[in-house]
């Protein structure tokens, strides 16, 4: 009779456990793998076992910091870190995790077409500028006053199919040598902030150029021509800004640059205005930072971290740092955690085969990683979802075994990477079935290493989340549960 064995095993990073429940692998589909048995009189048997590692061996963890993070895999964005609808700016620091500096680079387009009569009756050039921001505090000390400079872009920020965010991107190579505007800011933002900018000599030249431009350049069908002349801005912390200031996030759909000037109204305008009969008024032209109306705006988040002077200083040089007991996953382009499976893990799995001509098929492999602190505060600070990635540089997310079922039926997906917030629980459960199957067939270090990184919503691509994870050396290290099928080739006895 053709024979197939189905097994269930569990591996802890440091010790072997025997507290396994069969229901945990059979409540969704207790015939998992049966389609691989080519006959009508076949026997399917279930075994529950514990997978032991070699003495002193464990699923190890290390901290890494990647220069490039592609977001398409985790957010389904078509443009990755470009056009995120949010921007970061400011500086903050942490004694353990170092310094972070953020700048916002974006194109700006007229929020509405400027008609030929727009400047009629004016008797001044643009004489003042306001920046309207929709900010909230991310981290740091908001009482520390910061100075920001607003530079004109020297090069065009064109649309691109590149979905990678590069921490090494140097906006300094693409901006004018002198800032056009500057402003100071401190405090906790209250929704919309309107900030009057200091107009610098380069800013005066920009305003004159805007006023002298042919108004037809501002029509929607000429926006590409407009962007060739007025390429956009970079909002950058001044070098005088203290490192221990604050980091802010800004929502670009509510961000505008208003250029003000004085004009005299016609008689008919005064007549229809019941509230204001003054002839001289202040008017403005508004530039928008978003692509709300698909006007081809482009934005880039520039986020830089510096771990100098911290236990993680080696990350600056691209090195890995072994984690003992606790590992971390940071938001806002910070560090990730790499789990490396030892060879003995796969050797023990291979040893389950009755003979060498059997094949192991991974039906389901679940990764469990616990957080050390089970409090509402820790849960709120942590990522509400972690992703398991086979290549974090490109973020090739590992497919969920049940993802097709979850999209077509009411079956609850056993892996979604979400944090279990129940009291005393506090763990992430992730499906690593495809990773483990690939690792069985490939014994190189890259194939047997898995990166845990954050996942994000479309409006929080670099959120200020921070997750602590218990790893090898802790009281409850990483655990893997595997459901597998043993298949004998050719249906032989």
Predicted regions and their residues:
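Secreted, disulfide-rich extracellular signaling modules
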Residues: 2-15, 19-493
